[in-house]
Amino acid sequence: MGRTRYTLRSILGDWRFYLLLALLLAAFYFGLVSRLDTRYRYRHFAEIARFANVPGQAARQMGVEGRFDTMEQVWEAYVDCPERAEYYYLAVLVNASLAGSLTGVLFSFWIIGRGILGRRASQLLLRGAGRPAVFRQLLFPYLGASLLLRWGFFALCFAVLPIRVQNFPPGYFPETVLCWLLLSAADTAFFGFTAFAFHPYLALGADLGAAALVLLLPGAVRRALPLGALNDAGLWRTEALPGPRQTAAVAAGVTLLASLLGAWLAFRRKDLS
């Protein structure tokens, strides 16, 4: 079988790699765009901290009606309000999903860092096994194990966190969960296929870089743009942001595109070692 050497220069000069990375970023962005919405809605939490010893002022700041003696009572009243609970629990779900993705990245780092996939692929190729056999015996089991780890951690977080599904509007919770499951599938496919098509450590760096960008970008946008003033002027409406149904649809499409493109790149590579 012919041998193709992939150097850092050749990889960074390949437009297909950037296209694959752009698809991953799009999946992350559309799936976690609610972080910007959530952070905007909770932009006043820092101000609330100043009224920690004055529950009445904190309640007015949070838009909660009633008489309260402690901040715990204010917080419970805020969370129990159906109009607001959805955003609180969505933030919990997003943070739990990010923790689950971190476990998947750590698992991938251990697998790739030890060279398990590369050594095993080389052995199969030397024995005359075809590329489909390599994918069937190595890549697909790896992708499955990584997904199970991520989804399992998410299920564990859901089991231990105080998430009350009944506080979500009808259909909101399952669509949010579906969106995250699709995003984790896109991320796993990106890492696995890119590790085979290009280089494992490049895939790890791109994956971590994309995750870091998604985590930092909403906060940077929120600090750079006067969202409060724009909203008061009617120029920015958080209600115009994509909802869970739209984000799930976009994430599904991006997942499919990323998987197909990644598979095409990996199958075109002449050397998997």
Segments (PLM) and residue ranges:
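Aromatic- and glycine-rich beta-strand/loop motifs that create alpha-glucan
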Residues: 1-24, 196
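Junction motif at the cytosolic side of a transmembrane helix
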Residues: 7-10, 254-273
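Secretory targeting signals
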Residues: 21-118, 135-212, 236-252
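Juxtamembrane membrane-interface segments at transmembrane alpha-helix termini
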Residues: 34-37, 214-225
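Helix-loop junctions at the membrane interface of multi-pass solute transporters
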Residues: 111, 122-125, 266
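Short helix-to-coil transition segments within interhelical loops
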Residues: 124-132
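Short hydrophobic, aromatic-rich alpha-helical segments embedded in or entering the lipid bilayer
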Residues: 222-239
